Swiss-Prot record:
It is a multi-pass membrane protein. Signal peptide: none annotated. This is ESX-5 secretion system protein EccC5. Disruption phenotype: Mutants are defective in the secretion of EsxN, PPE41 and PE_PGRS proteins. Part of the ESX-5 specialized secretion system, which is responsible for the secretion of EsxN and a number of PE_PGRS and PPE proteins, including PPE41. Residues 476-678, 858-1052, 1161-1354 form the FtsK domain. Its main location: membrane.
Length: 1391
């Protein structure tokens, strides 16, 4: 039985003690000594005495010093001189020998002290080196010690990948200082100098220290020498690596034709292939040929670059595990596996001595017969080669096969994986062995949930959030997941679950969720189940009362991810507010208070535990990297309010590192890569066999258990019911048993289990992954008749769905499908819309829903038009749903108000979709560009209403529209204008199109925008850009609807950076945040969706309003007043009748009434008080001549004849005299000769007539010297008003040849001479009409211009006004800067 090993905290190694030693200065040879002065004096005196004595002797004649006697004084002299000058030749020293010996002894003592210091440093080096690189023969005894597998590939452990090969010499960690005042070679005292030299020689190296090579420096090493020595060293290297490096960090491979030499490596976990499994576990990576090795380990070289030396770098070692390959077969195919640059993360050891491996000197270790290794020397710190000549490197380590096998067998008892299995603990087998037995469920199809939960009602008890999910692998004991916080004795509050495809992750997620549901009633436990992908793991729980929401496919839209996070933040805020209202700090305290209150018969708002399951969260982090920090914050803040995160993914990588710090428990199934396993906190998960549901349960670093998850989605058989005459199989749980097999390096097939339960089948894939039966196409269990066999899990879920309980919904459906208008109105009113129909007392219309994920609701999106927001602006790009928004607004008003209360008049310039509202009783008109008259009449009608209400409100004493509504619909006493309208809405779909088509009309609309709201006339417009609106009216829209904008700069409700997040979907928009959220920008925005303008009974794709028309028509028979239209022909008598009743002031009433205004259906007069002339133009058959005939008919009605032949008029009655130019002779009978002074129809006649007219007008010129009173009374002349009527002026020559040029000077002085000029001209070539002097003069006099049927391509005619196609008799009467459409009264004209 294997024993578990978890890497403990590394022990502190012996510390190398570097020393800084300053060498002692050796002695110098003493210099010659000078003589004392007294000795010199004595010598001189003695020599003098001796000389005197000799002189006296010779002087006396004595022969004492004669002959042989002369020797005595000679010796005396020499002796004295020797005494005086001894040492002058250097033979005498400074000191005596005893003193010199003493100084030598002192120097030697100092060297001994330095030797001890150097030796202490050397001993620390030896202890340190042997700590990290012990002798191979000591490794077997150290197996299982804390020193095992201590190397770390984190870039900080400089011994990772460093392996001992023998013992040798190295320089000490001593810095030598030069002696001070060092004697020269001549001055050096020989004894101390020799001693210092020998000291330096022996202390410059440290002997018998481990010598190492690094796997991270060279891509391979060639071991060259006697085979037995080579194999002995390779065994030592393998044992060193296997002891100090875990199998998760270093893996080893042997390629050899001599398998007997390598049989012992089968025991080492480092030689196991985690991707291939056989009966003995991981398949051994021992191969007989390069071809076999390359075929099995092709993935090892895939995507890897050249070898990169990394030992000098502080970065983490990658890739891991580092791979060591022992090449013990001489095969030329190695050239196809490795090049001179090597392979990243791989180190080869060649044992063949082939030239392919030995050609590079720095990668060669040469043996001799004595076991001495020679190699190129390297710097100990940088591993750089410092010499190109091989030196003595080390005396090789040797390990025999027996020693190596003993070590390997001892190491085989330990595995990193087994550190998580807690082997050796003998737990008593108490209680149930499976989930159903634990809950006392005999029949999953017949569960008494009341009884089941009766014993688990204590939300504060130990069983809270504690549920079984599988069995321990070592003893089959039922394993529990406790999601409570660590301070409550649990494993949570949050956790992760990981496992590659086919590892059983989805099954485990379901099992944990269902087990928790069995342990808690829905009042106490709620789930939010989210899946970034399809949701296969969570969809089966739809409809279960424990489940608040199931959210799937989050990866399809990042906005949904942000929405989900907002919902979680909102739930934290909601729970915090509940706790604050009760005066408590957290959910635990709140539920304690609630339990006490319920015991007293008083209830409080529930605050159940909330488990948020997020499947495939790694995809979330990949798409939205900021989610890591957000979820980490949610986890930290939510724990106090019983919000628990359970996050699952196929893989976990470094980007989730911050989140993992806050995770308690970890359920880790098989990992795809070592990195994923490391990130999940269980490195050996990558080595798990391909068995669904098999994994590790990590509670803490020391408490990690291997388990087998229970499969609740097994077939369900009702107890007591036979199957094909046989009794249904009992649900059992036991442990698999496999017969023992011989353990070798060869692949050993896995035999079939002879005991244990049926395991859900899995299918192996070529890449080593497995697929669960749920993931296999056609994997559902069906009998021969195709009937699906029910599963235990689904049977339990079906029963849970029958429990009547409505959970709190903290996730509302995404804004993908618009709500029907009646459902929206019902939600807004709080009742069915048809009940108390028309009782609304305001003008608030719901048009859609506002998505508030933070508040967990979707309230109606409303438009309030009763106050400052009377006018509504809808902004949006093309295709954003502006027309639909208009339809919805009208339908909403129709469902909340009666046709007497609100009326709508629509101008559809965007599409025909708005015509679908035309049959709603509240809609009086829908006109578009194909009905320009209807458009003009609609605007004119509402403009007339504004003007009429200005007058009538004043007469009735109505101060505001609120008073008007109270009097008309609220029963308040007081007079009300009887205009037949309530609040009226002018709806313009595409303001810009209307403005471009009709300049005159848009000015009238602008008047309504600015003045209408005060009198109950509202304007609702749509536009792509706000800049399309005329500047004077941009501030006139108090209500604003922003859909997806064409330019985010137009956003006013939210900041532009948020407005760009509106999706490209019709009806989607954004409004400002309408609640307080301290951590949010108030202009961050909330997403909106316009409702569908149809009832809920219609299909979801129906946007026509027919259903609303039918529903509203059943409730009311009233109808909005239609727009009044002029008839196609309007007789002059009818105009005169209207004129007789006209009481208006300042419009020329009582004068020539010649047309009806479309604006207010009132007569149009030739108002001579403002202008004395009129021009008429239009295409053929448009009614120009008829216009003249009507005017002449009115002249005859209002004026007395004024021709020269006519009798004098009655006193006080004005008279008229007509001068007629009629080339087509159609007006000759319009007036009699009593009115027509002259007429002409050809050029000569016109010339003559103009001369006479000019003469007559010249006589009316005011003479000089008139008084002011005379000028004002125009008393200087008397006689009839002169009307110059010219039909078809284009038939007369233009320019200087114009026959009318004599009358032209009087046009601008017409008021002084009583002249009125009325001219018609065809429209063709109107742009060149200025060449005619008469028309030019009329333009200068600002004469009104009636443009009848015309070609708009002629461009602007006056100001920004254009002509256009019009029916006969219809025209645009243009003044200086305004225009109004009129219908000319018809008069019969001679043809």
């Amino acid at each position: 039985m294997k024993r578990g090993f978890a890497r403990p905290t590394p022990e502190k190694p012996p510390v190398i003690k570097p020393e800084n030693i300053v060498l002692s200065t050796p002695l110098s040879i003493p210099p010659p000594e000078g003589k004392p002065w007294w000795l010199i004096v004595v010598g001189v005196v003695v020599v003098g005495l001796l000389g005197g004595m000799v002189a006296m002797v010779f002087a006396s004649g004595s022969h004492v010093f004669g002959g042989i006697g002369s020797i005595f004084p000679l010796f005396m002299m020499v002796g004295i001189m020797m005494m005086m000058f001894r040492g002058m030749g250097g033979g005498q020293q400074q000191m005596s020998r005893p003193k010199l010996d003493a100084m030598r002894a002192q120097f030697m003592l100092m060297l001994d002290m330095l030797r001890e210091t150097a030796q202490e440093s050397a001993d620390s080096m030896d202890a340190n080196y042997r700590w990290f690189h012990p002798a191979p023969n000591t490794l077997a005894a150290a197996v299982g010690s804390p020193r095992m597998w201590e190397r770390k590939p984190d870039g900080k452990d400089l011994n990772f990948g460093v392996v001992r090969v023998g013992v040798g010499m190295t320089r000490p960690e001593v810095t030598w200082g030069e002696p001070q005042n060092m004697p020269t070679d001549i001055e050096l005292e020989p004894v101390t100098g020799k001693a210092l030299q020998e000291f330096g020689r022996y202390q410059s190296v440290v002997y018998n220290l481990p010598k190492m090579v690094s796997l991270l420096v060279e891509p391979w090493y060639a071991l060259v020498g006697e085979r037995e020595q080579v194999l002995g060293l390779m065994r030592a290297i393998i044992c060193q690596l296997a002891f100090s490096h875990g199998p998760d960090h270093v893996q080893m491979i042997v390629v050899s034709s001599d398998l007997d030499q390598w049989d012992w490596v089968k025991w080492l976990p480092h030689f196991g292939d985690s991707r291939r499994h056989d009966a003995a576990g991981n398949a051994r990576m021992v191969y007989t040929s390069v071809r076999e090795f390359a075929a099995e380990q092709a993935e090892l070289f895939a995507g890897r670059g050249s070898f990169t030396p990394r030992h000098a770098s502080s970065s983490a070692q990658t890739p891991t595990p580092h791979t060591v390959i022992i090449a013990d077969v001489d095969d030329p195919q190695w050239e196809y596996v490795i090049s001179a640059e090597g392979v990243d993360g791989v180190t080869f050891f060649d044992l063949t001595g082939s030239s392919m491996w030995t050609d590079i000197p720095e990668r060669k270790l040469q043996f001799d017969k004595t076991g001495v290794i020679e190699a190129l020397p390297r710097d100990r710190d940088t591993w750089m080669v410092i010499d190109d000549k091989a030196w003595f490197f080390a005396l090789t380590d040797q390990v025999s096969i027996a020693e190596a096998e003993e070590f390997a067998q001892k190491l085989a008892q330990w595995r990193l994986a087994e550190a998580y299995e807690e082997i050796g603990q003998r737990v008593a087998h108490i209680g149930a062995r499976d989930i159903l037995s634990y809950y006392g469920i005999d029949d999953p199809g017949n569960i008494d949930f009341d009884s089941l939960w009766a014993s688990r009602t204590d939300t504060m008890g130990r069983s809270r959030l504690r549920a079984p999910f599988g069995n321990r692998s070592d003893n089959g004991e039922l394993l529990f997941l406790d999601m409570k916080s660590l301070d409550e004795g649990g494993d949570g509050p949050h956790g992760v679950m990981s496992g590659t495809t086919g590892s059983g992750k989805s099954t485990l997620v379901r099992t944990v969720i269902e087990s928790l549901m069995l342990s808690h009633p829905p009042e106490e436990l709620q789930f939010v189940l989210a899946d970034l992908k399809g949701g296969s793991a969570v969809k089966p729980f739809a409809g279960v009362p424990h489940v608040s929401r199931i959210i799937t496919d989050l990866e399809e839209d990042q906005a949904l991810m942000e929405r989900f996070l907002d919902a979680l933040w909102g739930e934290i805020a909601r729970r915090k507010a509940i706790c604050d209202s009760a005066g408590v700090d957290d959910a635990k305290e709140y539920n304690s208070v609630r339990a006490r209150m319920r015991a007293r018969g008083q209830d409080m708002a529930p605050l159940p535990m909330l488990v948020v399951v997020i499947d495939e969260f790694y995809e979330w982090f990949r798409i939205m990297p900021t989610a890591v920090d957000v979820l980490d914050s949610i986890g930290r803040q939510g724990r106090a309010y019983w919000i628990h995160l359970m996050m699952a993914s196929q893989t976990i990588e470094s980007r989730a590192e911050k989140l993992m710090e806050n995770m308690g428990y970890r359920l880790v199934l098989k990992a795809r890569t070592a990195g994923a396993a490391q990130a999940a906190g269980v490195p050996n998960a990558v080595n798990l066999p391909a068995q669904a549901g098999l994994g590790y349960f990590r509670k803490s670093l020391e408490d990690i258990i291997r388990f087998q998850a229970e499969f609740l989605w097994r077939d369900y058989f009702q107890p007591g019911v036979s199957i094909d005459g046989e009794e249904a199989p009992a649900l059992v749980h036991s442990i698999d048993y496999i017969r023992p097999q011989l353990f070798t390096n060869s692949f050993t097939p896995l035999e079939v289990s002879v005991g244990g339960p049926d395991i859900e089948p899995v299918v192996a894939q070529p890449n080593g992954e497995v697929l669960e039966s749920d993931d296999i196409e056609g994997g559902e269990d069906e009998d021969e008749e195709g009937v699906r066999t029910p599963k235990v899990g689904t049977v339990i879920i079906d029963q849970l769905r029958k429990i009547k309980f409505e959970p709190y919904r903290l996730w509302q459906p995404p804004l993908t499908q618009p709500v029907a208008i009646d459902d929206l109105v019902n939600r807004f009113l709080g009742r069915p819309w048809h009940k108390e129909y028309g009782s609304a007392c305001n003008l608030v219309f719901p048009i859609g829903i506002i998505d508030r994920p933070y508040k967990h609701d979707q309230p109606p999106w409303t438009v309030d038009t009763s106050g400052p927001g009377a006018n509504v602006l809808i902004l949006g790009a093309g295709g954003s749903g502006k027309t639909t928004a208009l339809q919805t607004l009208i339908c909403s008003a129709a469902l909340t108000h009666t046709p007497q209360q609100v009326q709508f008049y629509c101008l559809a310039y965007s599409s025909t979709a708005l015509t679908t509202v035309s049959r709603i009783p509240h809609v009086g008109e829908v006109a578009g560009p194909t009905d320009p008259y209807g458009v003009r009449r609609t605007v004119a009608e509402l403009l007339a209403l504004v003007r009429e209400r200005k007058r009538s409100f004043l007469e009735c004493g109505i101060a505001s529209m609120e008073m008007f509504r109270r009097r008309k619909f609220g029963g308040e006493a007081g007079p009300v204008p009887d205009d037949g309208f309530g609040d009226v809405y002018l709806v313009i779909d595409n303001y810009r199109a209307l403005a471009e088509e009709n300049e005159v009309l848009i000015e009238q609309v602008n008047v309504i925008i600015n003045q209408g709201p005060s009198f109950g006339v509202h304007v609702v417009v749509t536009a792509d850009r706000e800049s399309e609106l005329r500047p004077p009216v941009r501030s006139g829209f108090g209500s604003r609807i922003e859909l997806r904008l064409a330019a985010v700069e137009d956003a006013k409700l939210v900041r532009s950076r948020f407005a760009k997040d509106v999706p490209v979907k019709p009806g989607r928009g954004m409004v400002a945040v309408n609640y307080v959220r301290l951590d949010s920008d108030p202009q961050a925005g909330l997403h909106t969706l316009v409702a569908r303008p149809a009832l809920g009974s219609t299909p979801d794709n129906v946007f026509e309003c027919d259903s609303v028309v039918a529903a509203v028509s059943r409730l009311t028979s009233a109808q909005a007043p239609p727009v009044r239209r002029l008839p196609a022909r309007f007789g002059v008598e009818q105009v005169r009748e209207l004129a007789s009743r006209d009481t208006r002031q300042g419009v020329g009433a009582g004068g020539i009434a010649w047309a009806i205004s479309e604006l207010d259906l009132a007569p149009v007069y030739l108002n001579f008080a403002e202008n004395s002339h009129l021009m008429v133009t239009g295409r053929r058959e448009c009614g120009r001549t008829t216009t003249l005939a009507t005017i002449m008919s009115e002249i005859g009605r209002l004026y007395a004849p004024g021709a020269s032949s006519a009798p004098p008029p009655a006193p006080g009655r004005p008279s008229a005299q007509v001068w007629l130019v009629d080339p087509r002779r159609q007006l000759l009978t319009a007036l009699g000769s009593d009115y027509v002074e002259r007429f002409a129809y050809n050029l000569d006649g016109v010339v003559a007539m103009m001369g006479e007219l000019a003469a007559a007008l010249a006589g009316r010129e005011p003479p000089p010297g008139l008084s002011a009173e005379e000028l004002l009374s125009r008393s200087w002349w008397s006689g009839p008003e002169i009307f110059l009527i010219v039909d078809d002026i284009q038939q007369l020559p233009p320019g200087f040849d114009s026959p009318l040029h004599k009358a032209v000077p009087f046009v601008n002085r017409a008021a002084d001479v009583g002249l009125h000029v009325i001219v018609t001209r065809t429209f063709g070539g109107w742009s060149s009409a200025g060449s005619d002097p008469m028309l030019r003069a009329l333009h200068q006099a600002n004469a009104p211009l009636l443009v009848m049927d015309a070609d708009p391509d002629e461009g602007f005619i006056r100001g920004k006004m254009k002509g256009g196609p019009l029916p006969r008799g219809r025209g645009l009467l243009m003044a200086e800067d305004t225009g109004v459409f009129v219908q000319v009264a018809a008069t019969e004209v001679r043809r």
